[in-house]
């Protein structure tokens, strides 16, 4: 009887511990979702990149002491929040321009966001492995490395979705001095590194440890980045005339015979009116008819462009293997 009661007490305690662990993870995942919603404020038009850096710092505190599986879920819910706010324009495109009802549009967005969030989950899963590989350096470089690796994979896998590249948020800011050298992906590493250093500074303060090395590292990075901004990394090699054209057609008009004819006329007229050597740009998929189905027009504008030594840049619907 005593043994049975003892085992029963142990079982109850285990259930109680499991309950509190589940409750704690639920709270952490909810906070991660909120962090994801706030992270997108770093991108245009808000440009609150400082908020985004602090959000990652908060996320690192949420990640403290978590196992790989829990980090996967934490990253997933962070990604869910980030993508829900970061690609809200897709809902506008699907609902208002694609004429899909509210329920259908919302369903498509949720499915898309759910898939994209896996990338953020993988980021934190990789972070867990890198952090354990080298505990001293991992606290600073594990998350930046994991973030950049997964961003690069996301930009290329399955034709890629290079949207919300974190490093782009500090463009034209006080700390974008390294951009000409390291590019957007390098900037991603840079801002996540800043967040990691801030996390370590706060952690040291909480443990009553003076964070002089971390604070000095942070100040040096910011100062060097600002100094690099003063350097002219490029020089002007010449000038080129550019004309940018937007057909301004509704979706229905664009895919109609009327829209095709109007777009072709605009392209032809823009080439005729362009200066010699000019760059003529029609953004996105201006021509919604394949080259094989439109050979006469394509050959005509190619000839005209060659005669005027100009370049035409546009998108076109293409079909392969019939």
Residue ranges and their predicted role:
Residues 20-230:
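Membrane-embedded alpha-helical bundles of multi-pass enzymes
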Residues 2-5, 45, 158, 237, ...:
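A generic fold-level signal
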Residues 1, 176, 302:
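Active-site phosphate/pyrophosphate- and oxyanion-stabilizing loops and adjacent acidic/basic residues
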Residues 12-13, 18, 278:
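Intrinsic disorder/low-complexity segments
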Residues 228-322:
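Soluble catalytic regions of membrane-associated enzymes that act on cell-envelope
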Residues 1, 150, 283:
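Active-site flanking residues adjacent to catalytic metal/cofactor-binding acidic residues
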Residues 7-9, 18-23:
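Intrinsically disordered, low-complexity serine/threonine-rich segments
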């Amino acid at each position: 009887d005593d043994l049975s009661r003892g085992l029963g007490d142990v079982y109850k305690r285990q259930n109680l511990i499991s309950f509190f662990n589940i409750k704690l993870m639920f709270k952490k995942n909810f906070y991660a979702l909120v962090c994801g919603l706030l992270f997108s404020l770093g991108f245009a038009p808000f440009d609150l990149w400082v908020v985004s850096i602090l959000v990652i710092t908060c996320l690192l505190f949420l990640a403290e002491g978590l196992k790989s599986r829990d980090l996967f879920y934490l990253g997933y819910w962070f990604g869910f929040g980030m993508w829900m706010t970061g690609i809200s324009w897709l809902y506008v495109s699907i609902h208002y321009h694609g004429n899909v009802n509210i329920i259908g549009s919302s369903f498509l967005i949720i499915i898309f966001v759910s898939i994209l969030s896996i990338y953020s989950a993988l980021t934190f899963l990789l972070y867990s492995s890198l952090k354990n590989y080298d505990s001293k350096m991992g606290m600073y470089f594990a998350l930046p490395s994991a973030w950049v690796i997964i961003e690069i994979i996301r930009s290329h896998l399955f034709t890629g979705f290079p949207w919300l590249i974190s490093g782009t948020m500090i463009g034209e800011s006080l700390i974008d001095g390294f951009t000409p050298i390291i590019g957007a992906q390098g900037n991603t590493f840079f801002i996540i590194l800043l967040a990691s250093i801030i996390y370590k500074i706060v952690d040291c303060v909480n443990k009553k440890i003076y964070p002089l090395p971390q604070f000095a590292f942070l100040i040096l990075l910011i100062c060097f980045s600002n100094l690099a901004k003063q350097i002219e990394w490029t020089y002007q090699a010449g000038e080129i005339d550019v004309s940018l054209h937007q057909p301004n057609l509704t979706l229905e008009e664009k895919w109609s015979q009327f829209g095709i004819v109007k777009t072709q006329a605009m392209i032809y007229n823009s080439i005729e009116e362009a200066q010699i050597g000019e760059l003529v740009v029609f953004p996105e998929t201006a021509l919604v008819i394949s080259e094989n189905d439109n050979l006469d027009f394509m050959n005509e504008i190619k000839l005209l462009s060659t005669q005027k030594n100009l370049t035409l840049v546009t998108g076109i619907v293409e079909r392969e293997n019939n």
